[in-house]
Amino acid sequence: MKVEKLNDIKNNSKEIIFNSNSKIVFFSDCHRGDGTYKDSLAPNINIYLSAIRYYYKNKFTYIEVGDGDELWKFKDIQEIYDMNYEIYEVLEEFKEKNRLYMIYGNHDKDKSKIKFLRKNKRRNRFNHSASDFYSTLEIYESLVLVHEESKKDFFVIHGHQIDFLNNELAFLSKFLVRYVWAILEAFMGFKDPTSPAKSNNKRNLFDEKISRWAEENKTRVILGHTHKTLFPKSRNESTYFNIGCCVLPRTITAIEIERGEISLIKWTIKADEKGSLFVGRDIIGGPIRIENY
């Protein structure tokens, strides 16, 4: 898809109005898996769980910007749901409070399809199913968030739509990830050369394309897909933000909007002076007033 097609997607996006009292957190590329050797989130699962519990307790709205579930490596979404049951309990609480929005990415687009959910109706021992969770939750391609006071808008989308190999050739990339790259990466350390998350050249080209589009269209963009954080310090630098991912070594990243300010956040495992481990939250970008963009 040509980058210009983002205009059509943006124009057809659900619009959400927020204000300077709103609290919003964006996560992307969680890649929740089934707990086997191909599960990229497994090493960080307690960091992620601690983070989302913090955001629920502090009354944030949770927006997941694609690739929340890893449906390229794994076929069975119920196995993913069962492995991440504590996580889904928290997400269910967000959902019940109308504080949950999900956007699909290339790795989890299937869960937005009714046909896929109908094929996955198996239940766990608690009589809960992934199908129940997702069939009552709209999965969006994109969202537009509008700041009530400044009228600044943020176009939120996963980003694979302008990545030829992961959009038009998604069927081929999915096959290679499931049967080739996931195994080579797990056992031999190879990195998938077709993915912007694993290829610096692809990522740089992707970032340049998005930055140029955002500038030309005078809009602010929040994406995932590349797994690499981007946080411009002002409009003069860029208006393209990248959330990063939840599958970095011992680290997950997120973007927060609170009190009319936007920040880039890092969650990691830390040790105190006595050697006790805990999950810590650090601001690594911002906070910067939304009006500055």
Predicted regions span which residues?
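Extended recognition/assembly regions associated with phosphoester-bond processing machinery
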Residues: M1-E64, G68-Y293
